[in-house]
Amino acid sequence: MNLSYNDYYTTSGNQDTWEVHLKPCTQKSTTYHAECVRAAQLIAEESSKQIVLMFSGGIDSEFMLNVFKEAQVDFKVAIISYGKWNKHDAIYAFDYCKLHDIVPDIIDLDLEQFVTSGLIYEIAEQGHCSAYQMTSVMHGIKDIDGCIVMANCEPQIGKNYDGKWMWDEPERTNCYRHWYQYAGIEG
């Protein structure tokens, strides 16, 4: 499975050589919500593995779960737990799962050990990651057997300096793409 449908979206380089490459659109898009439902269905069609949705308890990952449910796509849910360090967020994920009769897979990660062991730096290097908070997620997903799908905030769309609308893809979010490729993760 490609990391973007039909390699529509690809990147190259990092730091000073960071580039985003987009192919021309082949069809007119509809609403953001409808396109998300379509994306969920395309992921299901393309995936060779069980779909695993990473759920943080944030509104973006809750939206993702609701979209996959609406698309009638079979999925499992995984939650990364850092114990006391993300209890304030994870509680929403656990409450949602309980309310919707979902039994999540829980990935326990000792955040202090992850940092003090130097693994945080090793993964940052391997994934070309410039955002320390993403490395623990990268570590948490590496051993999940499935097609890993994550939500990552709303689309970053705004007006450019010349008044034209643009889509902004920060380099830091691309570290997941590097990590998926490095670790052989489908998603």
What spans do the regions from the language model cover?
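Nucleotide-activated chemistry modules centered on ATP-dependent adenylation/adenylyltransferase
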Residues: 1-52, 67, 73-187
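Class I SAM-dependent methyltransferase "Motif I" SAM/SAH-binding loop
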Residues: 55
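Catalytic nucleophile loop
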Residues: 60-61
